[in-house]
Design a protein with these regions (language model features):
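Low-complexity, acidic/polar, glycine-enriched regions of mature
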Residues: 19-177
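Bacterial Sec-dependent N-terminal signal peptides
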Residues: 1-26
């Protein structure tokens, strides 16, 4: 009888250890503290976030899911004419495509450095990108930081004077929900 209980106990323990529990945290953007900037050539500016969904677990990054929507109408280069050009049909075409979307399909991490592989949609064109980032965990708060480049012609941004490559920099302070 004792040996049966021991065997059953070991079997239950073995089965329980085969399943891992993930503890991904749901992070909320700090509305007035973030920055999404772009620069390239003589162009630089900011764009505002419309919405985010950040489910991130630094111990198990493969369980993470990140989605962000940016509001094209909020582009600000500090120059009214340049803003108008950026939102025009040969720029980002804010009228027809008011949102830029990023949605991760995989998140990996190693030694505090992470990468979100995802689909970036600009002007109705979707390309897979790799977004390297760091995460500074401060308990109930944290900060995501990352930089990546986009080739403007890949997204049919053809306005004369537009740089071939734009560097996008993210500084995203968050709170744990």
């Amino acid at each position: 009888m004792k040996s049966t209980k021991l065997v059953l106990g070991l079997l239950v323990l073995l089965m329980a250890s085969a399943f891992t529990v993930t503890t991904s945290a749901n992070w909320k953007l700090k509305e007035d503290a973030y920055s999404v900037t772009f620069k390239g050539g003589k162009v630089d500016g900011i764009i505002k976030v419309l919405n985010t969904s950040i489910l991130f677990d630094e111990a198990n990054p493969e369980q993470s899911k990140i989605t962000a929507l940016l509001d094209v109408s909020t582009i600000n280069t500090g120059n009214g004419m340049m803003n108008k050009h950026a939102k025009s049909e040969t720029g980002l075409n804010a009228k027809e495509f008011p949102v830029i979307k990023f949605e991760s399909v995989a998140v990996t991490g190693n030694g505090g450095m992470f990468s979100a592989i995802g689909k970036l949609t600009i002007k109705g064109i979707t390309k897979e990108i790799k977004l390297p980032f760091t995460f500074e965990n401060k308990g109930a708060e944290g900060v995501f930081k990352g930089t990546f480049n986009i080739v403007t012609k890949d997204f049919n941004i053809t306005r004369t004077g537009t740089p071939d490559v734009l560097e996008i920099a993210l500084n995203i302070p968050v709170t744990n929900q």
